[in-house]
Amino acid sequence: MNYAEKSLELHYEVKGKLETAVRVPVDSREALSLAYTPGVAQPCLEIQKDTDKSYELTRRWNTVAVVTDGTAVLGLGDIGPEAGMPVMEGKCVLFKAFGDVDAIPLCIRSKNVDDIVNTVALLAGSFGGVNLEDISAPRCFEIEEKLQARCDIPIFHDDQHGTAVVMLAGLINALKVVGKRIEDIKLVISGAGAAGVAVTKLLLSAGVKNLIMCDRKGAIYEGREGLNPVKAQLAAITNPKGEKGGLSQVIAGADVFIGVSAPGLLTAGMVETMAKDAIIFACANPTPEIMPDEAKAAGAAVVATGRSDFPNQINNVLCFPGIFRGALDVRARYISHSMKLAAAHALAALVDEAELGRENILPQAFDKRIKDAVSQAVARAARDEGIARV
């Protein structure tokens, strides 16, 4: 199937993948008076007395904003906010289909960090959470941090944290397959953008001790010249042995390679230098750092990619609907590391021992157990940490 042509036909035909649904009858004068004036004044007055009542008297409790500036849309790059709308609508469809979360796309005509932060912060009272989407690094870090400081609802950059959660879930199960412990492995990450940074932080929280990040200039280590503030911060908590050199040097002896970088970056020769039963997560899209067959031929035991046409797809849709479902259910103020760890472990646990194998380390996106498993784990973690409001 030619997905490009068929998708374009679909979008011309439906003219938008979302619409508003009405949840109350408006088929009589009495019904109209309850849904709108004069009756609607009473819930307004209740919310005026206590703004938290907006969660009980409006759809705020179940509504998320999907926010972009169009600067890093898929592999298309900076295409602008209007051009990003089909992706944002698609994201909203996934929220509803896989998490029963109502989501609204907000495409902002500005690349200025403060413009975006101010716009979203001023609208935050209408939503139970905000999903930041396809915003270029390093601005995405600053936007998320500033927004979370100003808002008392979850601000979640899915390109960072959703990727990290699914990566960790896959790694938990891949390590079971090869019989290794997370605290014993050497792990190399290629790519120090939004996803790479978030994956690094979550894997460190999960127990990885020997983790080396690589960017275009090679291994990141303390004292390396030209590091931006984010990379300098990561240099202080990664690469404990201070390894230097390019990817081809530092990958020697590694148990795990995680790629969130560029096509073809990992060669068969590099895989051959890795430890026995190596794990490869090659997630550059649409072309991975190395093709699965090539990685396996070079000795890799478990290979995952971001593509649906290969086994072991690392796909954010496995986690973000459930994470928001859980956060919204308990009115969490933010999404913490413990909530993300809980989501990853819940996702990994859905693949039982009998099904677990080299080509089956993650559940399928259409597995109906995912929403409840992930959301309940996230809600429980939020309550345990004191982040929940109900």
Residue ranges and their predicted role:
Residues M1-I155, S375, A381, E385, ...:
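N-terminal ligand-binding/catalytic initiation module
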Residues Y12, Y55-R60, K96-A97, L122-A124, ...:
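Solvent-exposed alpha-helices and their adjacent loops that cap or buttress functional pockets
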Residues D69-T71, I79, I108-R109, D134-A137, ...:
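Short, ordered loop/turn segments at secondary-structure junctions
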Residues L74, I79-G99, H157, V165-A262:
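Glycine-rich phosphate/diphosphate-binding loop of Rossmann-like nucleotide-binding domains
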Residues P105, N131-D134, I155-D158, I189, ...:
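General beta-strand structural signal in soluble alpha/beta enzymes
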Residues D158, A282-V390:
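Adenosine-phosphate binding glycine-rich loop
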Residues A232-A301, R307-D309:
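Rossmann-like adenosine-cofactor binding region
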